[in-house]
């Protein structure tokens, strides 16, 4: 029998396959969409392998070419639309032999695999066997020499799609933050019934051998106790747990009790700690009415959150670039993220480290297992311990190291402000410091610092701050007032309350406030104290950081709004919605939201708007709708930052599109306004608030016992904590190389260099806008 016919010469365009394997995770559809569109943009062809490795083994109609329009609307869909399965056949060589044959027949010699460590290991084994598989296919007559000759090299690129976030070498896996969102939503809902009946709840979350979901949900919800596989409790944990819960309820007046347990939790002797066992202990020892809630597969479902949408998109784009960059001898890469930076690392290094963690746990080598988790995991665990056990005698500092720390919010409200304050208060109480909340910003301080019996500066009790764990906005009040309006009164109030340090949470106004205080130190020695800014603003425009608290909450709120608007646009078929985003003169929110919702175009202040740009976009829309005859999901979204242009307002842009459409399609304007500030903070803003606030407290604490002149001489005594690339660091505000002099665009209230600007190109590529012509989309270019 003659072997099946396949192209003797390789196809003109390179063919890249994409598959999703293992357990499904929100964001997998974003990967497929990004790979397909980036491949087409790079003059390649994209093929989807349906049902994971099973589709690769069976071939035929389970390997299909996908075109640009086929993946429209996929970003907002949960699960994986190309299917996933755990394929036992592929684990055996005969199965991989069939898979190799099917790939050659389809002309595919590159594969992007999105799955867990097992799926990625299988992909790397497949690549290592590839030459031998082709040789065997020729020897057995399944294929000819001519058929296999163009496909001697197989390129594999891995993407980690897993809700467990159990892969070493990356801060986050695709789907983990969406899963964390489901958990936090569930626990937030449990709060009300737990409070009403003074009940305890034991909540079991997924994660297998990794405690990331359990740890982050415990931080996000202020859980009283936590069980994770990497750090089993010491013997006698039952007594310790009961003691903490009793103290929280009887001494601190806490009405609800939450215990988070990972499904793989065990003690130091590897005995499983089940949720039912914990419930029995609380019921029998404390006589506490306790319920067990096993969240199960609800943690996998639903649409991807904002973070997983843009992460899957950027990693999918990077995967195609990695395929095109790969050399034959190079190891297969896996695409990872460290803080805000997309990176590549050898796939098998990451897999091996991940498996080593599991082995250490099985060998009771828990310190080694913890050491192999990324530094972020260890920092979060440290922060949780230091903020969940106040008054612990082992953690208290000596009297001469204790400080009076002022805490103030400056600027517009942002998700995470309350959580940062809660973390700071809890850390202060744990270490013996005195946390002093300054209510209603600097104007509140100056007007009411001398009031009686209640003034604007008050000590914060643990009971008060603990209630802020999932509250949005700012409970101590915030506004845009600056100390420069009345420096003398500000200094007088600082002296009255004896502030030893100042913790400022807020946006560009907070940055400006600390700058004013720093510059006034010579005239007012009261300001010769350590001061640090924790950026919190939906605009994400604070110099010294690539991430601000509140920006993720804003993004999630905005994509929910856009998803609903897109549904309306698609139902009306030929309709464009122009949506106005906030963000001041920074286009961060508009750009990242555009990436997360698949916007056709994004207008930002950094690029501006002019008539030529609008004309090109209207032509682009006209061509799109002309090709879309009879297509589903045909609604379009354009995002416009509120300050992109003073002339071309959101309504004007919508009206121009409608006028130029000549009845072929229509447009509407939508302005979500302050809705974008969000309600409850997102889990990412909650956990980063804890981590960053704890780091700020450690930084301020390091100045205890130093003289005023020593503090003023240290450039880091007035600083901003921020994420830069793959690092979290403090940057000095003053000095020749400080943020004020080198990185701040004071006129536009944003950093001089904005890391996210290159994302505009990705938005344009994935919308098809970039391929219209090679002209720049910025009306400021060459101006």
Swiss-Prot record:
Residue segments, region N-terminal catalytic PFK domain 1: 1-389
Coiled coil residues, start to end: none
InterPro entries linked: 6-Pfructokinase_euk, ATP_PFK, Phosphofructokinase_CS, Phosphofructokinase_dom, PKF_sf
Residues the entry annotates as binding beta-D-fructose 2,6-bisphosphate: 480, 537-541, 575, 582-584, 642, 668, 674-677, 749
Keyword Magnesium assigned: yes
Pfam family, one: PFK
Compositionally biased residues, Pro residues: 1-10
Residue ranges, annotated region (Interdomain linker): 390-403
Subcellular localization, as worded in the UniProt entry: Cytoplasm
UniProt xrefs under PANTHER family: ATP-DEPENDENT 6-PHOSPHOFRUCTOKINASE, PHOSPHOFRUCTOKINASE
HAMAP family: Phosphofructokinase_I_E
Function recorded in the entry: Catalyzes the phosphorylation of D-fructose 6-phosphate to fructose 1,6-bisphosphate by ATP, the first committing step of glycolysis.
Name of the protein: ATP-dependent 6-phosphofructokinase
Species for this entry: Aspergillus niger
Encoding gene (name): pfkA
């Amino acid at each position: 029998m003659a072997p099946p016919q396949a192209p003797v010469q390789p196809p003109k365009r390179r063919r890249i396959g994409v598959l999703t394997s293992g357990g499904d995770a929100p964001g997998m559809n974003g990967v497929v969409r990004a790979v397909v569109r980036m491949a087409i943009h790079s003059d390649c062809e994209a093929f989807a392998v349906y049902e994971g490795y099973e589709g690769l083994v069976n071939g035929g109609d389970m390997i299909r070419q996908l075109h640009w329009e086929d993946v429209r609307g996929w970003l907002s869909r949960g699960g994986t639309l190309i299917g996933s399965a755990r394929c036992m056949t592929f684990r055996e060589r005969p199965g991989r032999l069939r898979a190799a044959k099917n790939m050659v027949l389809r002309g595919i010699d590159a594969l992007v695999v999105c799955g867990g460590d097992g799926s990625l290991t299988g992909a790397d084994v497949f690549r290592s066997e590839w030459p031998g598989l082709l040789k065997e296919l020729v020897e057995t007559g399944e294929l000819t020499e001519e058929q296999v000759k163009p496909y001697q090299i197989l390129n594999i690129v891995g993407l980690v799609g897993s809700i467990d976030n159990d892969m070493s070498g990356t801060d986050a896996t695709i789907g983990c933050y969406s899963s964390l969102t489901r958990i936090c939503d569930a626990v937030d809902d449990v709060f009300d019934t737990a409070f009403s009946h003074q009940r305890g709840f034991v909540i079991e979350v997924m994660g297998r051998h990794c405690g990331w979901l359990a740890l982050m949900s415990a931080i996000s919800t202020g859980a009283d106790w936590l069980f994770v596989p990497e750090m089993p409790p010491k013997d006698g944990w039952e007594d310790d747990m009961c003691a903490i819960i009793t103290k929280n309820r009887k001494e601190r007046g806490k009405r609800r009790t939450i215990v988070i347990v990972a499904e793989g939790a065990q003690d130091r002797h590897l005995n499983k700690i089940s949720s039912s066992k914990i419930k029995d202990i609380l019921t029998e020892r404390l006589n506490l009415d306790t319920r067990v809630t096993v969240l199960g597969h609800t943690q996998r479902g639903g649409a991807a959150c904002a973070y997983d949408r843009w992460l899957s998109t950027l990693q999918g784009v990077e995967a195609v670039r990695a395929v095109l960059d790969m050399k034959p001898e190079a190891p297969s890469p896996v695409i990872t993220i460290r803080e805000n930076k997309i990176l590549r690392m050898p796939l098998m290094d990451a897999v091996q480290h991940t498996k080593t963690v599991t082995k250490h746990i099985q060998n009771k080598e828990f310190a080694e297992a913890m050491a192999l988790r990324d530094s972020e995991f260890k920092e979060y665990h440290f922060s949780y311990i230091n903020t969940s056990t106040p008054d612990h005698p082992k953690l208290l500092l000596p009297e001469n190291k204790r400080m009076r720390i002022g805490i103030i919010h400056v600027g517009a409200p942002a998700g995470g402000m309350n959580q940062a304050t809660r973390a700071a208060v809890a850390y202060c109480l744990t270490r013996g410091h005195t946390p002093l909340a300054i209510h209603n910003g600097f104007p509140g301080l100056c007007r009411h610092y001398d009031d009686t019996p209640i003034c604007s500066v008050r000590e914060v009790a643990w009971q008060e701050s603990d209630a802020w764990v999932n509250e949005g906005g700012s409970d101590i009040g915030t506004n845009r007032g600056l100390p420069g309006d009345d420096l003398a009164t500000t200094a007088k109030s600082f002296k009255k309350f004896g502030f030893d340090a100042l913790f400022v949470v807020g946006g560009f106004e907070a940055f400006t406030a600390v700058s004013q205080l720093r510059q006034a130190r010579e005239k007012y020695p009261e300001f010769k104290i350590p001061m640090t800014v924790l950026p919190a603003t939906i605009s994400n425009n604070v110099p010294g950081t690539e991430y601000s608290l509140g920006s993720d909450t804003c993004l999630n709120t905005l994509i929910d709004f856009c998803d609903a608007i897109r549904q309306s646009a698609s139902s009306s078929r030929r309709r464009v919605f122009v949506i106005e985003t906030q963000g001041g003169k920074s286009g961060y929110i508009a750009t990242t939201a555009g990436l997360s919702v698949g916007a056709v175009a994004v207008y930002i202040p950094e690029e501006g708007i002019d008539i030529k740009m609008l004309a090109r976009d209207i032509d682009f829309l006209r061509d799109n709708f002309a090709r879309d005859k009879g297509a589903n999901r045909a609604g379009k979204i354009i995002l416009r930052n509120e300050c992109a242009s003073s002339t071309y307002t959101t309504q004007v842009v919508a009206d121009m599109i409608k006028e130029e459409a000549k009845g072929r399609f229509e447009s509407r304007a939508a302005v979500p306004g302050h809705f974008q500030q969000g309600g409850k903070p997102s889990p990412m803003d909650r956990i980063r608030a804890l981590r960053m606030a704890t780091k700020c407290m450690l930084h301020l604490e390091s100045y205890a016992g130093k003289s005023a002149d020593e503090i003023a001489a240290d450039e880091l005594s007035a600083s901003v904590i921020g994420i830069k690339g793959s690092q979290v660091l403090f940057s000095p505000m003053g000095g020749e190389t400080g943020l004020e002099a080198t990185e701040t665009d004071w006129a536009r209230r944003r950093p001089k260099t904005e890391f996210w600007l290159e994302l505009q190109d990705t938005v344009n590529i994935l919308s098809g806008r970039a391929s219209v012509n090679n002209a720049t989309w910025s009306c400021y270019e060459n101006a």
